């Protein structure tokens, strides 16, 4: 019987909040970060198109267990819409499919914003990762198929016009999971009777991470010049954010070393006293500030669902 292979790389855990440059895919970015940090595993919390820049949260090691909590968080984008053309991809990359010589007045743009605020029905772009009959919509679109993608409910918490010129308008949006900014540009262009597509897109916030957490890729690549590997990896690790920061919106309990050991073995712990937290389907436990487990609080117990190495 063969022995199980040891995973390659370092067993590090944490979040790297990358400021992704333009013309760089999300999967490519994750591979680059995994290689730089010599991490055993890595994953991202929400695709950012190659034509978009900005925040790409990348989880290393055990932090990949917390990716769903970041993917569900609010996001903020700054984007520019170019009026006069609707494109097949709803951004600069696609072919022009409709055009107009009309341009919207700033007052008309502002009057339209309330329609796209709150819970709205939105049809994702033809070139998107939505699955239709088991296949990605973008694969079908590349084969020349026009597919009927059903509308989905998404939530827009805030949509602001921050600048306007005859053929361009700059916006900022705070939105929930699953919102396509490209679809928003397409739909606003149709409503204004002039058509439109995304000319630039930058993500500046993915809850709970902010702009101050972002690290430019060039800064990380520059550390490759450090010849001593231990010194180089230590310099890279300084940019990591603790795994537990991704869970800051969940209820939290602090446990002692004995309780942490029980949780890591998959066993529940009893919560006593008048300060015991109320029942909740999800909470996280830490010992001395380090993440131990995600679980539920029920019947006076914390019951672990996912555990993290010490």
Curated annotation (Swiss-Prot):
Single GO term (MF): tRNA pseudouridine(55) synthase activity
InterPro entries, alphabetized: PsdUridine_synth_cat_dom_sf (IPR020103), PsdUridine_synth_N (IPR002501), tRNA_psdUridine_synth_TruB (IPR014780), TruB_C (IPR032819)
A family per Pfam: TruB_C_2
Enzyme class: isomerase
Keyword Transport: no
UniProtKB keywords: Isomerase, tRNA processing
Positions of the catalytic residues: 49 (nucleophile)
Catalytic activity of the protein: uridine(55) in tRNA = pseudouridine(55) in tRNA
Purpose of the protein: Responsible for synthesis of pseudouridine from uracil-55 in the psi GC loop of transfer RNAs.
Family: Belongs to the pseudouridine synthase TruB family. Type 1 subfamily.
Protein's recorded name: tRNA pseudouridine synthase B
Species of the source: Sinorhizobium medicae (strain WSM419) (Ensifer medicae)
